[in-house]
Amino acid sequence: MEPLDRELDEAELDLPSEPMLLNMGPSHPAMHGTVRIVLELSGETINKADVQIGYLHRGFEKMCERGTWSQVFPYVDRLNYVSPMLNNVGFALAVEKMLGVTVPERCQYYRVILGELARICDHMICSGAMSMELGAFTPFLYLCRAREIFWEIFEEETGARLTHSFGRVGGMARPPTADFKAMVRVGLARVLALVNDAEKLILKNRIFLDRLDGVGQISQEDALALGWTGVVLRATGVPYDVRRANPYMVYDRFEFDVPVGTRGDNYDRFMCRQEEIRQAGRIIEQALEQMPDEGPINIDDPRIVLPPKEEVYTTIEATIQHFKIVMEGIKVPAGECYSYTEAGNGELGFYLVSDGSGTPYRVRIRPPCFATTQGLSQLITGLMIPDVVPTFGSLNMIGGECDH
């Protein structure tokens, strides 16, 4: 056969020209949680993307309405299960808002420190997973080792490494351990050093940068229209952080910056998370300095807080108080409220309705990554198939939170 001296067009080659459908998920290794993405392709270019969520729906809201207010804490742990302490604190603040109570100052600092430790864990695992999905496995191991340091602190304080169920209406389950501050100071220094080491491995890697820079971009207007909050919104240049815009607990006493990006691409989302790790470290250091060494953790109200165990076993009054709170629940005044905090993925909101009984009448959650996931199809349309994984990873979609 004589060699051709010209290029053949598609008609001569008789190649199929219709688009191809490709399923990614719901059980794909790169799908954080269980998500199905149906891609319409021309070659390897994505023409359309249909993102289907809901595979991890567990009826969270209805489960919360079956028990007492205190029995909700194990459920909220399993929303964003990468940073469960932030969920605990968010729900506790919502119920306390309905009760009209404020926890002691020492408890507020304790909540801030534990919450910021959880935020750092959340950001580290998201950044590490993105790195691993792009072929950089070593930084992921560095960041997992860093998370292990904080998990040991959580285990010492709460008894659990991941799902703590440590929050309580009116306070926390227990006061800080004697060496809590020392553990956090030492652990924070080690973690920040590991974060710096992990960054050195990838931030000058040309392959890593090319896969993130300019990929998965979104404008400020589109991000706001989709209801985005958190890192993904700040990466577009909008400096909205609930801790700064509407300070709760003692966040108004801390000096910290709100990292923002400029283009809203994968690289900006990655770098915003890395800088937020350092800002969370600043908050923790200030909170450790300001936190009182003595004082109550829980409010002094027998209608809300369980009595000490030694009193339950020795006095009839404490036994009755314990029995009524456990069996009947805390009597929250009839009404409704919306309370929101800055969780790992953005604004985590709880809309609560009480009929005056010890059981929630209605619990509605505003999960931040539910709104974020709605924008995924817009982000990946026009990209290549390999770009789906790092773009999806940069959004940090957590199945338990999104599907609840």
Curated annotation (Swiss-Prot):
EC number: 7.1.1.-
Subcellular location: Cell inner membrane
Top-level enzyme category: translocase
Top-level taxonomic group: Bacteria
Bilayer topology term: Peripheral membrane protein
Broad class of the protein's primary localization: membrane
PANTHER family assigned to the protein according to its UniProt record, in alphabetical order: NADH DEHYDROGENASE [UBIQUINONE] IRON-SULFUR PROTEIN 2, MITOCHONDRIAL, NADH-UBIQUINONE OXIDOREDUCTASE 49 KDA SUBUNIT
Name of the protein described by the UniProt record: NADH-quinone oxidoreductase subunit D 1
Biological source species: Sorangium cellulosum (strain So ce56) (Polyangium cellulosum (strain So ce56))
